Amino acid sequence: MTPFELLKTACHAACRQTPACAPSYRAMLKTENISQMMAVWREYWEDISGGKYADIINDRLPAAYPTLRKEMNAAGIYVNECPKMAPEFVRVLVTDCDRIVDIHDYAKCYILGNAIVYAWDHSQVYSERSDKAIIALNDHAYGYVSKGWVIAVNAAQLWTAADAVLNGSVTCEAHGGTVKAYAYRKLEASGDTQVYAASERNITLDGNATIHPLVKED
């Protein structure tokens, strides 16, 4: 079975695990080559990065990627790697990975598994599936982190519902978890967020969010 056939088999598996086979899976089953498959992935990206298919991709794609890499990269889709020059067209899927994955330029990264991701330049990172994901936002990077742990520095922007550390001219919108704010530009906290900061300057609390003194041990 070729790597492309393995991906189509994964589509069958995803269909069997959903009450009604999603249009995206049916479209993937009709594809005849990896170029067509990548076009369907882009059209139905939410299913690829957030649906049941994401779990199957996390398990099966890394083994098939070396063979499919050239064609996938031609479509602007990468797995556990990112080119230094990466326009907004570039999308990176990060699966379970035992090395740091650097995201550059304007690429958009979607974390599916347990991994460490460093975001640079104006890149974007989305982490909504793995509690063990670790994300570092540098430069002007943006992060949407509902699962995992994140540190934001420089002029990064962060939306988070997970535990986070801020240490720079960072803008943060927190909707849960614990936020340790060593340095920041603006912090808005809501839900049950617990904020640890040296002062309340430029911090807005809503809902049940609370603020506590930031001490050296933190």
Write out the residue ranges for each language-model feature.
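Short, glycine-biased loop/turn motifs at secondary-structure junctions and
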Residues: 1-218
